[in-house]
Curated annotation (Swiss-Prot):
Transmembrane intervals: 37-57, 59-79, 100-120, 124-144
Source organism: Pongo abelii (Sumatran orangutan)
Subcellular location as annotated: Membrane
Entry annotated with the keyword Hydrolase: no
Domain of life, source organism: Eukaryota
Name of the protein this chain belongs to: Transmembrane protein 42
Cellular component, GO annotation: membrane
SUPFAM superfamilies named among the record's database cross-references: Multidrug resistance efflux transporter EmrE (SSF103481)
Keyword set, alphabetical order: Membrane, Transmembrane, Transmembrane helix
Disulphide linkage map: none
Length: 159
């Protein structure tokens, strides 16, 4: 059987194999959007459970807390911390990169901490704090954004 000639530079092109269907890019393959959704969902849950663990630790180790509330806070902190790590590891397995998962968990943790701080302790955040949250959100959208690939032609060798 004769071998088909390849393109210059040793790269494989789709025209060399006309019977083989072209594959979709990874972000358009079947189930990729579902995996991305579950990755983001698990990371958002991990951030929320992390904030809940921190809030329960603050309740448990407060200065005016009874012994029963302290024990309950430690139990809630340990269980929500283990749930946070479970959801984070699941989010890592579903995500396309660990950077996306880490930034998503961080953003979710910050917003959940602000919400729980307001509900449980009456804390209000300053404008500078919300500016930092906005910058984190901008970074998150830049990381999640999929830019089209830029293909550079291979330089031809001069003989």
């Amino acid at each position: 059987m004769a071998e088909r000639p390849g393109p210059p530079g040793g790269a494989v092109s789709a025209t060399a194999y006309p019977d083989t269907p072209a594959e979709f890019p990874p972000h358009l393959q079947a189930g990729a959007m579902r995996r991305r959704f579950w990755g983001v969902f698990n990371c958002l849950c991990a951030g929320s459970f992390g904030a809940l663990a921190a809030a329960s630790a603050k309740l448990a180790f407060g200065s005016e807390v009874s012994m029963g509330l302290c024990v309950l806070g430690i139990i809630v902190m340990a269980s929500t911390n283990s749930l946070m790590w479970t959801f984070f590891s699941r989010g890592l397995s579903f995500s396309m990169s660990s950077a996306i998962a880490s930034v998503t968990v961080t953003f979710s943790n910050i917003l959940s901490s602000a919400f729980l701080g307001y509900v449980l302790y009456g804390e209000c955040q300053e404008v500078l704090w919300w500016g930092g949250v906005f910058l984190i959100l901008c970074g998150l959208t830049l990381i999640h954004r999929k830019l089209p690939p830029t293909w550079k032609p291979l330089p031809h060798k001069q003989q």
